[in-house]
Swiss-Prot record:
Gene3D superfamilies: Aspartate Aminotransferase, domain 1, Type I PLP-dependent aspartate aminotransferase-like (Major domain). Belongs to the SHMT family. Catalyzes the reversible interconversion of serine and glycine with tetrahydrofolate (THF) serving as the one-carbon carrier. This reaction serves as the major source of one-carbon groups required for the biosynthesis of purines, thymidylate, methionine, and other important biomolecules. Also exhibits THF-independent aldolase activity toward beta-hydroxyamino acids, producing glycine and aldehydes, via a retro-aldol mechanism. GO terms for molecular function: glycine hydroxymethyltransferase activity; pyridoxal phosphate binding. This is Serine hydroxymethyltransferase. Its cofactor is pyridoxal 5'-phosphate. Pathway: One-carbon metabolism; tetrahydrofolate interconversion; Amino-acid biosynthesis; glycine biosynthesis; glycine from L-serine: step 1/1.
């Protein structure tokens, strides 16, 4: 095709104006189906949330076209004056949200934020302490298949068997024995508050850095409804989705300027090249939303809803690890009912209630089977569910699980169908992206 012809112009106009449904109907269909799933199912996966239209707009903006290696004012590419504005806004808003001096908003995920901290604070072979994955920790805190377990020497602490709370005596004992370089607090399945002051005291006693991974509860911290890692932590990381209700991504926070420089170097050029500027802009939008008074109301509702859900499930005859929750999530221990997490997840999915199978402390089952499910309230709270709705959701969960216990792994199809109808009645009352 020769340059400058009418057909060339038409092709270019089509490239810049054609809708997705025209150019790629297969992907458009998958996206439409996912929208329908989100609209009509009750989302209880603790690590998921629903972002605003504004966040979607920022993430789908022309900023996706821009390469911007480096940091604001110190880029390796020209034409970065406007993406610098977006990143500087994200940094400033993050610092205001968490009351800290320095923020790196470039990590593409919470896992990469954690890797950046490890790279900055440790050398391969160094020892660190983290919560055991089976007790509610995270893969990046030393699980054998993860780079954190391959490059470094993880030592895991756990929870007390009698109450499933962090065993701080064990943390102190292991710290004195192993003299770790870093001690981590945080995880993906721990429903209680953390004693950050005690962790810092233990870290100081052995000359370790204290690192908080607050990926799950950062939004509650930002709202002032959960203990803050600062001033106790040397560094904190978080994802920007989950309770922060932003785009999928990560972030590193600190009050130590010297450490901040190390973290910046670890992320770029250590782990990443060009940052995702469209995602960083969406982070800035979400942080701006979280600075508004309405966000504190939302975060309080998340916590109230979680307590209502946990209480309802306990009243239905099921165990919640540690006896309840202080944050947005809970683990339902299914062992006394003879159920597996895998079967429970599948049964609830058939009723259009989405959750995930999850190990419970001292779980005898394999990670692919598990003895529990993890439930969280952020996403359904975003769509407007309150305590009354979550009490109903808890009752629906109990009905499905009871049917599973009565009928075996295939579940009770009659109960599941009836619950599904009630689920749709609920979601229809609280529409999203309509």
């Amino acid at each position: 095709m020769s340059a400058g012809t009418a057909s060339d112009t038409t092709a270019l106009n089509t490239f810049f104006s054609a809708q997705l449904a025209e150019t790629d109907p297969e992907i458009a269909k998958a996206i439409s189906q996912e929208l329908g799933r989100q609209q009509h199912e009750i989302e209880l996966i603790a690590s998921e949330n629903i972002v605003s239209r504004a966040v979607l707009e920022a993430q789908g903006s022309v900023l996706t076209n821009k390469y911007a290696e480096g940091y604001p004012g110190r880029r390796y590419y020209g034409g970065c004056q406007f993406v610098d504005i977006a990143e500087e806004l994200a940094i400033d808003r993050a610092k205001r949200l968490f009351g800290c001096g320095f923020a790196n908003v470039q990590p593409n995920s919470g896992s990469q934020a954690n890797q950046g901290v490890f790279m900055a604070l440790m050398q391969p072979g160094d020892t660190f302490l983290g919560l055991d994955l089976a007790a509610g920790g995270h893969l990046t805190h030393g699980a054998p298949p993860n780079v954190s377990g391959k490059w470094f020497k993880p030592v895991s602490y756990t929870v007390r068997r009698e109450d499933q709370r962090i065993d701080m005596e064990q943390v102190e004992r292991l710290a004195q024995e192993h003299k770790p370089k870093v001690i981590i607090a945080g995880g993906s399945g721990y429903p209680r508050h953390w004693d950050f002051a005690k962790f810092r005291e233990i870290a100081d006693s052995v000359g370790a850095y204290f690192f908080v991974d607050m990926a799950h509860f950062a939004g509650l911290v930002a709202a002032g409804l959960h203990p803050s890692p600062f001033p106790h932590a040397h560094v904190a990381t978080t994802t920007t989705h989950k309770t922060l209700r932003g785009p999928r991504g990560g972030m590193i926070l600190t009050n130590d300027e010297a450490l901040a420089k190390k973290f910046n170097s670890a992320i770029f050029p250590g782990l990443q090249g060009g940052p995702l500027m469209h995602v960083i802009a969406a982070k800035a939008v979400a942080f701006g939303e979280a600075l508004k008074p309405e966000f504190k109301i939302y975060a309080k509702q998340v916590i109230d809803n979680a307590k209502a859900l946990a209480d309802t499930i306990i009243s239905g005859g099921y165990d919640i690890t540690s006896g309840g929750t202080d944050n947005h999530l809970m683990l339902v221990d299914l062992q006394k009912k003879g159920l597996t997490g895998k079967a429970a997840e599948a049964a609830l999915s058939r009723a259009d209630i989405t959750c995930n199978k999850n190990g419970v402390p001292f779980d005898p089952q394999k990670p692919t089977i598990t003895s529990g499910i993890r439930l969280g309230t952020p996403a359904s709270t975003t769509r407007g569910f309150g305590v009354a709705e979550f009490k109903q959701v808890g009752s629906l969960i109990v009905q499905v699980l009871d049917g599973l216990a009565d009928k075996g792994e295939s579940g009770d199809s009659t109960v599941e169908a009836a619950v599904k109808e009630k689920v749709h009645a609920l979601t229809d009352r609280f529409p999203i992206y309509s």
